[in-house]
């Protein structure tokens, strides 16, 4: 079955999840360093408030944190981390599939281009995607999405012995006592 967005769906642009656990808070859309400046520039030129936090960092020595950031994350505009700030939820215009329009669709991050293909072992389709929920089978036309994921993986490959993950401190009010902020060494 060929992958296509489900009619009227924008779920992947709205709902963010805790990853890898609630402790780390909700994750934003993965942004590579070379994408960060373009996204910040677009937001500034269109008077959009965005929050970009670090996501993955590396170091060659065990220290208090990373020396280089290899990935960032674009956080949602709601206090709980949900809803991409580039998702136009106020316009009456809709995308070809009937969902909300993306203000940066032509220049969206590789992570958005890769979706619903996600990094797992083995690479899979995101089970939370409405298309994947309803079809339950592997889509046959996800070559472009797979290529985007491969580009991300290639750009994040490192020989650094220490990899750090950033806890966003962002999540639902009901989880606020469990969520932390700051860098954590991956073990």
State where each predicted segment sits.
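Short loop/turn segments that flank or connect secondary-structure elements
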Residues: 1-187
């Amino acid at each position: 079955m060929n992958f296509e967005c489900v009619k009227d769906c924008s779920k992947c642009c709205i709902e963010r999840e805790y990853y890898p656990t609630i402790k780390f808070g909700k994750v934003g859309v993965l942004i590579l360093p070379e994408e960060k400046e373009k996204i910040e520039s677009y937001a500034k030129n269109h008077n959009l408030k965005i929050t970009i936090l670090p996501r993955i960092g590396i170091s060659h020595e065990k220290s208090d944190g990373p020396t280089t950031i290899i990935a960032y994350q674009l956080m949602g505009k709601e206090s709980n981390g949900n809803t991409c700030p580039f998702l136009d939820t106020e316009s009456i215009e809709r995308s070809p599939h009937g969902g909300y329009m993306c203000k940066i669709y032509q220049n969206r991050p590789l992570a958005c281009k890769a979706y619903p293909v996600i990094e797992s072992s083995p690479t899979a389709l995101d089970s939370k995607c409405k298309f994947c929920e309803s079809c339950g089978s592997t889509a046959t036309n996800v070559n472009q999405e797979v290529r985007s994921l491969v580009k991300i993986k290639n750009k994040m490959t490192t020989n650094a012995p220490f990899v750090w993950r950033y806890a966003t401190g962002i999540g639902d009010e009901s989880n606020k006592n469990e969520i932390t902020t700051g860098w954590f060494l991956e073990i």
